């Protein structure tokens, strides 16, 4: 994503729709006409935009630990405070405050190494880039009205113990899609791909089979 990893530090603000365009452009650049796409958390917001803006690029869609709705006023205000915090205090302080929200308490207690790896990844990002990503999420569009335009096979996967995205929000996403299954995993938090990789992989495999991409 823009601003993360080895990408350049963004100068101008950008939107979730811009990141969806980036993803479509990447597929074009590496000569992949269409793909099964999984979007985790922020990636799910990007995937929803990609399905509307570049529908021919997506053959199947997996929404993982994510939702269709926009930020509430309270959540948007909290993001502004977090943006200021990460700029003032740095990425390490942000990671220390953020990472505990990502995992279920039981998993975090039993797997400190995995939690530590997540902390290292987040704390290694640039504060300005984190703030810009938070701002893009704060201003993202409510995609609920567009869900009935999506015809590709879809699946919603998440943890019932997710502290950031409610089970209700994930069910609302699934119900708005015409061809979509849902798997909510017990005793799993936001990091469903880390806490329950086998179950997530199974659902992705099932999605690929439904889309005729996997035998």
Language-model regions, residue ranges each:
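Active-site loop/oxyanion-hole signature of alpha/beta-hydrolase fold enzymes
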Residues: 1-38, 199-206
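Conserved catalytic-core motifs of eukaryotic protein kinase domains, centered on the activation segment
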Residues: 7-13, 72-75, 167-168
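Conserved hydrolase catalytic core segment
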Residues: 29-72
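Short alpha-helix in the alpha/beta-hydrolase fold that links the catalytic acid
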Residues: 152, 166-175
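Short beta-strand/loop motif that positions the catalytic acidic residue
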Residues: 150, 156-158, 162
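Alpha/beta-hydrolase active-site loop signature
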Residues: 1-5, 68, 189-192
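Catalytic active-site module of serine/aspartate enzymes centered on a nucleophile-bearing elbow/loop
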Residues: 180-215
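Conserved alpha/beta-hydrolase catalytic His-Asp/Glu region
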Residues: 70-77, 89-149
């Amino acid at each position: 994503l823009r601003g993360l990893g080895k990408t350049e530090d963004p100068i101008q603000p950008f939107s979730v729709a811009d990141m969806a365009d980036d993803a479509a452009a990447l597929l074009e650049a590496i000569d992949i006409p269409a793909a099964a796409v999984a979007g985790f958390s922020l990636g799910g917001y990007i995937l929803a935009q990609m399905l509307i803006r570049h529908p021919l690029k997506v053959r199947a869609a997996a929404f993982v630990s994510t939702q269709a709705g926009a930020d509430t006023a309270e959540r948007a205000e909290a993001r502004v405070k977090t943006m200021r915090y990460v700029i003032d205090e740095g990425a390490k302080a942000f990671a220390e405050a953020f990472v505990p929200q990502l995992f279920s308490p039981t998993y975090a207690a039993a797997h400190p190494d995995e939690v530590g790896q997540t902390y290292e990844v987040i704390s290694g990002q640039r504060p300005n880039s984190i703030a810009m990503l938070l701002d893009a999420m704060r201003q993202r569009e409510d995609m609920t009205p567009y869900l009935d335009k999506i015809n590709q096979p879809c699946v919603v996967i998440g943890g019932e113990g997710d502290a950031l995205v409610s089970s209700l929000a994930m069910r609302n996403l699934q119900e708005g899609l015409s061809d979509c299954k849902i798997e909510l995993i017990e005793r799993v938090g936001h990091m469903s791909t880390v806490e329950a990789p086998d179950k997530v992989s199974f659902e992705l495999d099932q999605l690929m089979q439904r889309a005729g991409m996997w035998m």
